[in-house]
Amino acid sequence: MKVFYHNDLDGRCAGALVAYFTGNYSPEDYFEVDYVMDLSVVPVADGEIVYFVDYSFKENTLDFLKSLQERGCQICWIDHHTSSINLCNAHPELQSIAGIRDADASGALLTFKYFSPYGDAPDFVKYVSDYDCWKFQYEPQTTFFKLGIETVKYDALDEIWTRLLGEMWTSEIGYLIVTGRTIKGYVDKTNDYYREHFAYESEIAGHKCLVVNQKTNSWVFGSKYGEYPL
């Protein structure tokens, strides 16, 4: 068995779910990948089971997928990116590949649904999907969990996932959320100070905007975010 998973929180969570449901925790079978890596360097045997989770194939990488099909590999492809869905529409022969291609949920949540179609996904999987798809239906827990889990090792086979999937999951997820809440509080206070001292108004194409010269994300705008059209 080989498992290819995307190198972000969603992909790592998806990879962890493959390990949990298949019972295969062999590190030599798991490969964290991005979109510039050459997947063909990974040795895959003819007829082998191959999982791609939270991974988007495109026209220039399609040959690898087709080569696995031709070699009789049992492929499971789970992804939520629009590029994957468009690729399947453009190549009907890909529709027969097992898995789920659906833009309504993240790769991790789709992976859970694939293995447990009638089960209710754990809260942490919902938080991962909520953040990755930018839906934020479970805020503030979504952001707190994301920040909290980034304080520990969270690769696909790291212990954090087995703890989150274990009997003590409530205390584990609670600890991560509390940790994330503390981090977010610090970030917000730091952003407030920086914005209050260094932000200034300007215009872009005639539209009033607030400018903050800092390498950061939109959190730096705080409550000002909704006061400007840009």
Residue ranges of model-derived segments:
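Accessory alpha-helical/coil subdomains and C-terminal extensions
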Residues: Y138-H197
